[in-house]
Amino acid sequence: MGARNSVLRGKKADELEKIRLRPGGKKKYRLKHIVWAANELDRFGLAESLLESKEGCQKILTVLDPLVPTGSENLKSLFNTVCVIWCIHAEEKAKDTEEAKQKVQRHLVAETKTTEKMPSTSRPTAPPSGNGGNFPVQQVAGNYTHVPLSPRTLNAWVKLVEEKKFGAEVVPGFQALSEGCTPYDINQMLNCVGDHQAAMQIIREIINEEAADWDAQHPIPGPLPAGQLREPRGSDIAGTTSTVEEQIQWMFRPQNPVPVGSIYRRWIQIGLQKCVRMYNPTNILDIKQGPKEPFQSYVDRFYKSLRAEQTDPAVKNWMTQTLLVQNANPDCKLVLKGLGINPTLEEMLTACQGVGGPGQKARLMAEALKEAMAPAPIPFAAAQQRRTIKCWNCGKEGHSARQCRAPRRQGCWKCGKAGHIMAKCPERQAGFLRVGPMGKEAPQFPCGPNPAGADTNSTPDRPSRGPTREVHAAREKAERAEREAIQRSDRGLPAARETRDTMQRDDRGLAAPQFSLWKRPVVTAHVEGQPVEVLLDTGADDSIVAGVELGSNYSPKIVGGIGGFINTKEYKNVEIRVLNKRVRATIMTGDTPINIFGRNILTALGMSLNLPVAKIEPIKIMLKPGKDGPKLRQWPLTKEKIEALKEICEKMEREGQLEEAPPTNPYNTPTFAIKKKDKNKWRMLIDFRELNKVTQDFTEIQLGIPHPAGLAKKKRITVLDVGDAYFSIPLHEDFRQYTAFTLPSINNAEPGKRYIYKVSPQGWKGSPAIFQYTMRQVLEPFRKANPDIILIQYMDDILIASDRTDLEHDRVVLQLKELLNGLGFSTPDEKFQKDPPYQWMGYELWPTKWKLQRIQLPQKEVWTVNDIQKLVGVLNWAAQIYPGIKTRNLCRLIRGKMTLTEEVQWTELAEAELEENKIILSQEQEGCYYQEEKELEATVQKDQDNQWTYKIHQGGKILKVGKYAKVKNTHTNGVRLLAQVVQKIGKEALVIWGRIPKFHLPVERDTWEQWWDNYWQVTWIPDWDFISTPPLVRLVFNLVKDPILGAETFYTDGSCNKQSREGKAGYITDRGRDKVRLLEQTTNQQAELEAFAMAVTDSGPKANIIVDSQYVMGIVAGQPTESESKIVNQIIEEMIKKEAIYVAWVPAHKGIGGNQEVDHLVSQGIRQVLFLEKIEPAQEEHEKYHSNVKELSHKFGLPKLVARQIVNTCTQCQQKGEAIHGQVNAELGTWQMDCTHLEGKIIIVAVHVASGFIEAEVIPQESGRQTALFLLKLASRWPITHLHTDNGANFTSQEVKMVAWWIGIEQSFGVPYNPQSQGVVEAMNHHLKNQISRIREQANTVETIVLMAVHCMNFKRRGGIGDMTPAERLINMVTAEQEIQFLQAKNSKLQNFRVYFREGRDQLWKGPGELLWKGDGAVIVKVGADIKIIPRRKAKIIKDYGGRQEMDSGSNLEGAREDGEVA
């Protein structure tokens, strides 16, 4: 310490302690900074004695100056300290560090006569290589010369490596020492390292790799002129094949300089970083602060690991700002988050000093109380009781024993008794056991001591003085007086009773104001007429409020609480009005975080703390009508199972879940036992299949399991489990008898013991639905009281997530546990998860990510069908986060009808697929949580095996992935499959997130629109973007719509004999060529395909092919990309080779040109030629109205093939394909309405959902008034009971709502792109615009053409339900509805009559029977299960009047009746 003590002495040391560390800061320099600087100098090979003089400090600054821009924080601090010491030695006055640096800078500029400024240490910037004053390459007289490295620099480098042993400090140390060096100098530094040859070898390998990459990227340009400097190779940069002079020339030549020194330094840094990672394998993500570890120690470890990270400065800066705070312990994290955004390291270290001590915790609690005042106040525990102040030391009033000046007396300062101290005084305990009556007979306020009588310090069940009997007698007397007073006020003041009734929250047996603990009990009180918000705190002895002026008649008091001691003013006999009751009590005013009423006022108000026990009401369950319970015999069981079942039943009986069945119970269900997963314990199972058949049906309330990707990102998560979930739900008493079962005995040694369930049993079909319903009812108040909490409940698994503090989050979890425990649900501690990772629903959750729990694929020698099914199930489960999982070939192993135990023979493709899946599963994948404010996106990709994969993400964060490989058709088209994939993703997104994502599809827009022309039903697909990730979905061949001029035309045909299965396929061309092939074991369709394949194979690059097979035309027009048919795949391969191909269809056997010739060629005139009439009138009809296929077929009697060909040959109708009609499940009165736009006009469209009938017209503006007028027109023409629209402003306007109310229309609204929304009218808008485009030239104005198009669509378009036009279908539905209503009305009248009748010669009257129908000559009567036809003359019809029936004695009873009823 000698040298260190001699650095600054006497006045110089005093001057040091006057200089501030920061401008305007409080901290100043101390001698410890000098000691630290002396230690740091040794690291740089500098003697600490240099600090003793001005010249020595100047030498230090000269060495440190070039290292500051790229140096560490320690280096900058050392530089700053030396600047301050220099100023003291030079007798330069400096107030702080910055001023000292400025003075040093001016001095250095004056001495070196240069304008260069000292680098700033606050924001390091890397200087360009070669710009400095102390570098090995220096400019002398305009020439660059090389100065070898000094021994001090080499010694500092060797010492750094030896001390740190390739720690994280080696990389920045090398950067600083090698700044401006040539490769020669860097090799000299590496050669100085004697040990650590393994690390040196790693560096050499990195150098070789980088040199090879350099050579590959910079090829030799060719021979150079004599005397010209060559370009450096990789070995030149490494210094092995180049001289120092060449290196300097490359670095500093005027044109195209190559900084070989900087490049070589970067290579070495890569190698050093690799060595650091090898010598220090700790990941920075694993650097976390221990519970009791000082924050400074944690920061040291963090930065040491940070230096070893191989990443750019931006990422390191992010790690510093994020991970340093995130991985701190909870105490430090709470402090750091209070510092705001991006605090400095010094601020962090200062704030976290002493974290964890009692003082810091008290400060945190006080601050938390103050922060919580605005949103929701939290209780503040007041100090010790000081109501009736009497000194137990001297016996005088007016002061306490603490303030007494008399000599101390032994004993308790609270009660004055000996044997204990005040902290353990029994009088300080608060008892809240209720003595008074509970229920509806209770008074307005719960019973308690009389505020004017009993001492408010005493508790209801523990007297402070006097015998217990006297206290209880006084309490009962006060209670009787209070009840009588309230009863008198009720009799005299009805308003008082009404006011009290309104204050009661619900009827749970306590007729008094009740405060739910779902939130803090805060009420408004008036203190001497001044309103204040106060917290009712049963844990506080005194009452303290702030902001109230009560005058000067007070006594000063000091009370203690969580936040420390508070100076207060105590006022006695203050009038307080709260909850419509007035009392006088003692209250204090002071600087309290929250206003509280303690027990002194609560007791005076007559309040008490009660715990009402809630009860789950059982739900009434019945058997199906006419069914009885199960009566099955118990099958034999092994002795081991019987003993296990006996033990289980005895335990369940003790816990109240079972009870013995009475001997009168006739029902029984077999029971048995199986081993649990651990193979040590048994599980009781009961075969409730028979009981499930006869039990009434239930509805599953929760249809699916929640997905972690749908959870919002929260800071804190807790997972808990409801133990014995079903066994916590009581079973209705009337149903318990049906759950009876019997425990048999060995050898029938004794009668079996019979039990019935008192709770919902496992295996019974009603347990899940009842449990779900009950849990929803239980948790509903909790959800409403905590809207910021995410509560996910699926069966017995509960997840709670929030952004609250640890304390608040744990408090909410504790409230939930207490709620469940209070209702009889257990929450076992072994399944309570407070710290990540959380095991939940098969997932592994973390606060910022989620994963699947570990997936282990089975390893088997012999695989059965059941094993493959389980394997595929596991892989499908993994596919939600592991992209690339495939199961197609595995599923093919178990195609067909196979038993579960049948052995499976593996194929090579299936084995390869399984191995590929194993590789995918070996790489762990993570998912992220949903952020509602960000856009939801879905990216779809297609692999080479026609399997589709997709990921749903928000930016770069993946929420989940999935796959799709369903191929429903033999011949598939990639675009059609893509539409199916989008539909699946859309449905999945609606279920999980309730919104449709934006799609990124691997298809070109032209390809999509070309296919969409024929399959326009996919127009509901929302916004999508094209992505160029191969393989793209393409239409593989160019199918043109018009005949190709100059190309050869092929007419194809095929035929087959159904008996012999022999056939022919062939073609004939317009150029005289023909070809026929004999086929065996074929079909007509196969023969047609063979003929088409022959034509495609034998044709040139362009061809016209005419077919008469609708089957072939349908396959080719669909443009399949692959097929399971060998012939179709051959056709696809051949058509890909064609430049263009035109395919058309003509009706078979119509005598059409080459088609007739090829028909004779392949069938030799066997077929009969039919000529169809009325083709021309049908074509004229279509050209005028553009009718659809079914309308032409119906009106002109044409086959559908011919009618479809007429439509297909129409250029306008060919723009969009024929609609694929489906059945819409809709009521008669349901309409959908929407507005669309055309040519700048607004068209309002209404569609009858069930029939497709359309009403449309042009409106001047899209307003509520115009929409309401159109709705009135619509309602005046057609029956309408339900109108469905989107949520546009015109449809949600008051005018439309008023019209809907006046007419009696139920109005509902949908959302865009929802398949269950306004899809019918959206599609009809599309139809209407297409129809208008076909006939647009027939009218001038939009108003006219809209009405003409509506006429065509309603009367000229046939198809759908009933093969009718929309107008016919709507009228048919209206008339059918009227007829049904008439018949139902008539049948309901007939049901009011009974028939007595005679049969044959039997003179006895029989009956009564139920009248089904009454005709002119006979009636139809139902008697029991028989239906009889009785002549009118043998039947007597009477009306059923309930309890009185009159016989019809004459035919006049069937005519006019007094009540007007006629049978």
Curated annotation (Swiss-Prot):
GO cellular component: host cell; host cell nucleus; host cell plasma membrane; host multivesicular body; membrane; viral nucleocapsid; virion membrane
Cofactor(s) needed by this chain: Mg(2+)
Start and end residues, zinc fingers (Integrase-type): 1173-1214
Chain segments carrying region Dimerization/Multimerization of capsid protein p24: 279-365
Cofactor annotation remark: Binds 2 magnesium ions for reverse transcriptase polymerase activity. Binds 2 magnesium ions for ribonuclease H (RNase H) activity. Substrate-binding is a precondition for magnesium binding.
Activation and inhibition: Protease: The viral protease is inhibited by many synthetic protease inhibitors (PIs), such as amprenavir, atazanavir, indinavir, loprinavir, nelfinavir, ritonavir and saquinavir. Use of protease inhibitors in tritherapy regimens permit more ambitious therapeutic strategies. Reverse transcriptase/ribonuclease H: RT can be inhibited either by nucleoside RT inhibitors (NRTIs) or by non nucleoside RT inhibitors (NNRTIs).
Disulfide feature: none
Pfam families, per the entry: Gag_p17, Gag_p24, Gag_p24_C, IN_DBD_C, Integrase_Zn, RNase_H, rve, RVP
Chain ranges of the Peptidase A2 domain: 532-601
GO molecular function per UniProt: aspartic-type endopeptidase activity; DNA binding; DNA-directed DNA polymerase activity; exoribonuclease H activity; lipid binding; RNA stem-loop binding; RNA-directed DNA polymerase activity; RNA-DNA hybrid ribonuclease activity
Gene Ontology biological process: DNA integration; DNA recombination; establishment of integrated proviral latency; proteolysis; symbiont entry into host cell; symbiont-mediated suppression of host gene expression; viral genome integration into host DNA; viral penetration into host nucleus
Record-given protein name: Gag-Pol polyprotein
Biological source species: Human immunodeficiency virus type 2 subtype A (isolate ST)
